[in-house]
Structure formats: structure tokens, C-alpha cells
Amino acid sequence: MAFINENYLKLPGSYLFSEIARRVDNFRKENPNAKIIRLGIGDVTKPLAPAVIDALHKAVDEMAKEETFKGYGPEQGYSFLVSKIIEYDYMPRGIRLDEDEVFVSDGAKSDTGNFQEIFGLDNKVAVTDPVYPVYVDSNVMAGRTGKYLANGYFENITYLPCTAENNFIPELPKEKVDIIYLCFPNNPTGMTLSREELKKWVDYARENRAIILFDSAYEAYIREKDVPHSIYEVEGADEVAIEFRSFSKTAGFTGTRCAYTVVPKKVVAYTKNGEAHQLNSLWNRRQTTKFNGVPYIIQRAAAAVYTPEGQKQTKETIDYYMENAKIIKQGLEDIGLTVFGGVNAPYIWLKTPDGISSWEFFDIMLKEINVVGTPGSGFGPSGEGYFRLTAFGSRENTLEAVERFKNLKF
């Protein structure tokens, strides 16, 4: 008899965005003529930059010729891409990295979900709350979280509430933790940490031999000068932090899949008898066993993001989305809602009015004005009473959604 991994049975219901899709599909069947505007899941809508498309075409042509054909590539990524990542994303901020500290992958979702595999099951995990569901769910699957409780928490996870009451800035945990997930600019709240606030976490990790898993997938959307783009801008972070980045939101690669993870060789974790081991070598071992690398043509496309044309074109797209964020934020404030985010991130986090629950507000938005967002409670118990909208729609749909907001009744 084959036995299942019973930890999967601890996962509550379906994945958040699957549940949203189910509800929207049911509504569409009952209302086939409704024009639904989707401001929920964070998928982009603008096409890939011309420089990226040109590089894709050239790479595809290379694959058609015997002398330039590429088969299996390095699991860690081709040097032509890794060198550009270091040159453009880190060196201008005074951060020095070796090429073997950067691992190209098929997505930050994959890496943030998979990185926990190299840690023991008895590590104490801390997450901000609300939080991107992958961080928690992947630890549930591994068997690290204990039981799911009636209050929406897992018994062995330390939750760090981020609400309007603390300006969405998580406090250091009162109990000792070993693995800390941080995402800034934050998904879902759209809020950020200053360099001083981030330093507190680095200092905590250094003092407690903890590891920070830092998701900075939205760093390209930062507008304010005092907001760090990388955790490695903080002294000592290269001893305790892993950083995840993605081309998905930076350059529209949600459908082409390319990202990277930085694992400095200084970062170590320990065996039970106290022996230190580099996470870099462990992650490399994991990747070479379970991952065959990102396709050559996709990495050529990603490298084109760093050309002068690619930089200009991707910045224009990011500016487009951030203008959408400004429009949504202003539109919601104009009808009297309390709104956060949308300044350094493409996410708008609003307080639901009159004590309405997150899912109740979802249903009101869908049924009354045919606009889809994401219930805050889907990101964790501290997200109850909040709602996320994204700026990744078209300008036309964004403006139309803002007009529809005026018809909301609550």
C-alpha cells in the first residue's frame, strides 16, 4: 500500500487564487454578459519589451542551426545572464557578488517554496501576517508547521502581524526563531521597510544565527530614495540572508518564467552537533539534483533586459503600472476608503468599510461592479478586513474600475 504525505491534508481548502477563479467562473456562468475587470492575481498585461522579443527571436534562430544549438545548460544559469545581473542589479548599490552566488531559476515562487527543503524540520519559522501564501504552504507540506488551528494559524509558526495599527512594520519576534520570511516591497500590503528597520532584522538574525529569506520581487517598483532595493545594502546581511528576485513583474516574464536567487557563500546553517555548512553548496546540490536550468532562449531574453533599450523599455512599463497604482489609490480615497501601498509597489491594500469581511467585500465588488480583487484574509488572519487590488491591468480597465468604484454601496 502506498501512503501519502499527510501534511498536505493540513492545507486549508484550495489555494487562494484557485478559490477566486472558482467564484469568478461561477459568477460568469450566471452572468455571461458581465464585463469583469480583474484586479486580483498579480499577473502582468503589457507585452514583453521589443528588446526582449528581438533577443528571443535571435535565440530561437540559434536553436535551428547545428553550430549554435544549445542543449542542457548549466543548472545555475548561463554566465552571460548572471554577469549582467551582478553588474546592473547589485554593483551600482555597492554590493559585490561572485557568479556562483547567483542561481537563475524559473520563478521566485518556485525558489521561495523550495528553499525550505535544505533546512531541518525542527526549525522555528516566522512569517509576516498577512503573507504570500507560498511561504506558509510550502512549510506545511514539509511538515514543519504543526496543526492548523481554528483561528487560522498553524501552531508551530510564529506570525508577525502587519496592520494599520503598527504601520505594517513587523516587530521582532518575542520568541527565538530560526527562519524568517520577509517580502519588501510587500505583497500583499504594498508597504516597505526603511534601511534602519531592515537593519533590525539583520542584527536579530546575526545575534540568533537565524536565516532571512528575503523576497524582493518588486524592488524595481520602489520610488522613494530611502527604501533599500536589496537586503545586502545592510551591513552583515550577506552573512544571514538569501535574496529572491524575479523578471516576472520587472520585465513581464510571468509567461516565460525567469528569476534568480542570491545565496552568498558566507551564509551558513548548522548540524545538530554545531558544524557550519554553506547554504550555497547545499542549494547548488539541491538544484543540480532537481532542476535542469532555465531554457537558453529564455535566459537570452532576460539578458536583453539589461541592454540600454531593454532598460528603457522595461522602465516605461513599470512606470505605466505605477501610474495605474496612483489612479486606483486616488480613486479609492476619493470615495472615502482608507488605502495603503501603491507608492513603492504595484499593490493597493485597502481597509474594507464598515467592518465588512474580506470575502464579503469580494462578493460585493464582483456582483455590484464586476471588479475582481483579492480578499486580505486569504493572505493570513491579520489580512481580515483588508482587500488587495493590483495595478497590472490595462489603463482602460483601470480607469473603468475607478469609475465603477463610485457605484459601490456599503
Swiss-Prot record:
Q: Which reaction does it catalyse?
A: (2S,6S)-2,6-diaminopimelate + 2-oxoglutarate = (S)-2,3,4,5-tetrahydrodipicolinate + L-glutamate + H2O + H(+)
Pathway listed for it is: Amino-acid biosynthesis; L-lysine biosynthesis via DAP pathway; LL-2,6-diaminopimelate from (S)-tetrahydrodipicolinate (aminotransferase route): step 1/1
Molecular function via GO: L,L-diaminopimelate aminotransferase activity; pyridoxal phosphate binding
What positions are modified (N6-(pyridoxal phosphate)lysine)? 249
Q: Which residues bind substrate?
A: 15, 42, 109, 132, 187, 292, 388
Q: Does the keyword Transferase apply?
A: yes
Name the protein family.
Answer: Belongs to the class-I pyridoxal-phosphate-dependent aminotransferase family. LL-diaminopimelate aminotransferase subfamily.
- Subunit notes for this chain? Homodimer.
User: What protein name applies here?
Assistant: LL-diaminopimelate aminotransferase
SUPFAM superfamilies listed in its UniProt record? PLP-dependent transferases (SSF53383)
CDD domains to which the protein is assigned, alphabetical? AAT_like
* Enzyme Commission (EC) number: 2.6.1.83
Binding locations of pyridoxal 5'-phosphate: 72, 108-109, 132, 187, 218, 246-248, 257, 292
Work out whether the entry's keyword set contains Transferase: yes
Purpose of the protein:
Involved in the synthesis of meso-diaminopimelate (m-DAP or DL-DAP), required for both lysine and peptidoglycan biosynthesis. Catalyzes the direct conversion of tetrahydrodipicolinate to LL-diaminopimelate. Can also use m-DAP instead of LL-DAP as the amino-group donor.
Q: Which NCBIfam families match?
A: DAPAT_plant (TIGR03542)
Q: Which cofactor does it need?
A: pyridoxal 5'-phosphate
